[in-house]
């Protein structure tokens, strides 16, 4: 009787060993995939304009140029002021946005443009626009789709570089 019981116990143990081993392998594979997957890039935060680089290499800083940019989970608030030949210009914007590794979209809420020597421009018309996101080496590049804005590169370091060809390159620092 003892041999039969131990033989039965061995069969039960062997029958349980395969499913347990398979389960352990699946758990290990799932954990390794989970650790290997990076969370999606987040652009949430507050940014200040550190400096603007002009085509001739000149770096313009406060007080000639100041700016702040805030991304919440779904809103963007952008303000920038600069002086050119002693005349001030500014842009203010509020928009709703979505961002992922493939697409950036915005809905205009408010836009104001005060260019030196020109009448104020206000835009509160609802408009929904999209732009492709190009991911490379941890950076996300987006041609901002509203109001002719520059191309923005969201860096892996959390900072932003915004550029308009032959006009400027703005360097934005993320605040802690």
Q: What label would you give each PLM region?
A:
Residues 5:
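Short polybasic linear motifs
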Residues 1-2:
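Methionine residue identity
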Residues 23-30:
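Bacterial N-terminal signal peptides
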């Amino acid at each position: 009787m003892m041999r039969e019981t131990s033989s039965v116990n061995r069969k039960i143990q062997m029958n349980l060993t395969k499913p347990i081993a398979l389960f352990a392998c699946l758990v290990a594979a799932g954990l390794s995939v989970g650790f290997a997957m990076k969370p999606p890039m987040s652009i949430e935060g507050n940014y200040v304009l550190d400096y603007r680089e002009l085509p001739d290499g000149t770096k313009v800083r406060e007080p000639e140029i100041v700016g702040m940019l805030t991304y919440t989970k779904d809103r963007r608030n952008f303000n920038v002021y600069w002086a050119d030949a002693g005349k001030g210009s500014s842009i203010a914007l509020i928009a709703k946005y979505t961002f992922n590794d493939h697409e950036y979209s915005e809905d205009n809420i408010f836009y104001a443009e005060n260019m030196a020597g020109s009448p104020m421009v206000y835009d509160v018309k609802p408009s929904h626009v999209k732009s492709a996101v190009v991911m490379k080496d941890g950076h996300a590049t987006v041609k901002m789709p509203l109001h002719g804005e520059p191309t923005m590169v969201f860096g892996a370091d959390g900072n932003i570089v915004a550029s308009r060809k032959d006009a400027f390159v703005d360097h934005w620092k993320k605040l802690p």
